[in-house]
């Protein structure tokens, strides 16, 4: 008998009138022990249940947020047939800044790129960053932050976490960017805090954080935004 369940949680409190969405499991029987044939089976499974896994745009990473440099890169990509420019790590772009000035700056660049047949995207760092004792995930072994997958990381179900996702979505809605490169995407860190607004404690922390980040990825997929994230999110686009 196959038993599939989370190692922790969900420990979800379902209020009257609410709906609970559980996890999905895909089973695929093989008709052969041949390694190559099994590989083809796995490929067909991913193409069927996650067709976005076939997306493979030709893109350029750009480490500058200077509008003149970005336009030059767009022109170069249009000339050689590249499909996308990602304003990447070290560029200075801040997708968490949803001020009118920042939105206007990047929307004008998105419009310029689209007129050239090129899409524009951006980078954002999430997990491997230290915010504060009140925001970061709490290690259940120590009762303090630190010692997690990337050292320390913000809890996605803190007020800071929800604000982060609101800012990212707002930035994409208003600029029209079509690629999101997420660095240090949620790696499964648990959080023992009992003071974060959107989870109760350790038992529901992983479940709620995972669903928070996949909600963003699903929204992006629904709106034609290419997501450059680790493979283990392929089935949650």
What are these regions (language model features)?
Residues 104-105, 137, 143-237:
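Active-site neighborhood of glycoside hydrolase catalytic domains
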Residues 1-136, 162:
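Conserved structural scaffold segments of CAZyme catalytic domains across common CAZy folds
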């Amino acid at each position: 008998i196959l038993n599939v369940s989370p190692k922790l949680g969900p420990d979800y409190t379902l209020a009257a009138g609410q709906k609970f969405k559980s996890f999905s499991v895909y089973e695929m029987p093989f008709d052969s022990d041949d390694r190559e044939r099994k590989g083809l089976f796995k490929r067909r499974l991913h193409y069927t249940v996650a067709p976005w896994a076939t997306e493979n745009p030709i893109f350029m990473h750009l480490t500058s947020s200077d509008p003149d440099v970005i336009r030059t890169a767009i022109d170069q990509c249009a000339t050689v047939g590249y499909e996308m420019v990602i304003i990447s790590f070290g560029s200075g772009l801040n997708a968490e800044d949803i001020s009118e000035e920042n939105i206007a700056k990047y929307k004008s660049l998105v419009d310029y790129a689209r007129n050239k047949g090129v899409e524009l995207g951006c980078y954002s760092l999430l997990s491997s960053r230290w915010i504060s004792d009140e925001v970061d995930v709490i290690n259940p072994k120590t009762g303090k932050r630190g010692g997690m997958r990337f050292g320390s990381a913000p809890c996605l179900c803190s007020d800071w976490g929800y604000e982060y996702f609101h800012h990212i979505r707002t930035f994409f809605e208003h600029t029209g960017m079509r690629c999101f490169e997420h660095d240090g995407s949620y790696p499964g860190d648990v959080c023992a805090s009992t003071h974060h607004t959107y989870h109760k404690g350790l038992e529901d922390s992983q479940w709620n954080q995972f669903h928070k980040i996949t909600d963003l990825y699903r929204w992006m997929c629904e709106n034609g935004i290419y997501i450059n994230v680790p493979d283990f999110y392929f089935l949650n686009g």
